[in-house]
Amino acid sequence: MADENSGRHERRSQRDRSESTQRRVLDATLRCIGEQGYVAVSLQDIAEMAGVSRGAITHHYPSKIDLTAAAIQHFVQWRYERVNAAFAGKDSIELRERLDILWGEFQAIFPITFELIVALRADKDLLALYRRNAKGRIEEITTGYDDFFPELSGMKVSGVVIAVMAAFYRGAYIESVARDPAYIEEMRAVFQDMLAAYLAADRKTA
């Protein structure tokens, strides 16, 4: 019995170490892509960032495409968890305040988001693998954002509205590279007004 328990503990420890290594590798992949861009990053760059050997990476992810596809899924889940933590205990705040929180979170991680979008656009094999691996997972996580915006409850297009929010914030961040910050704030205010008006009109017709 002692040997059996010892064996189980060893298997769990090996599994825990393997999962920990994979998380470090995926985190390092995202950091490297965010800093250097997908095309410029090599597996060796990622290995050095993660503090592991190149072989430790290829043991789990045979190619850069396999690794990046897994890293994108990891990023989507991590982003959702980050936003979820930011909204913790803030259920009763106004819509505009919640939109400000979402903007702040998306803005903080946009460099990675942007580089991942560029990677998916540039590498058709990566895009195909990512779509196969993701399946309904992305839609599932996107649907979770509804919890932060109860105003969307019952809407047939709630997922679309969330996607519109995310698309606007991505676009606003790109604009912020060359635009005056005051102009970006004006854009955000107009968007919030438009969204509030749309939601109010939807409630009236419901």
Task: Map each language-model feature to its residues.
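Amphipathic alpha-helical packing segments from all-alpha helical-bundle domains
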Residues: 80-85, 104-114, 124-151, 159-160, ...
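Hydrophobic alpha-helical connector segments
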Residues: 66, 70, 77, 81-110, ...
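Residues in the helix-turn-helix
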Residues: 42, 56
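HTH DNA-binding helix-turn interface
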Residues: 35-38, 51, 58-70
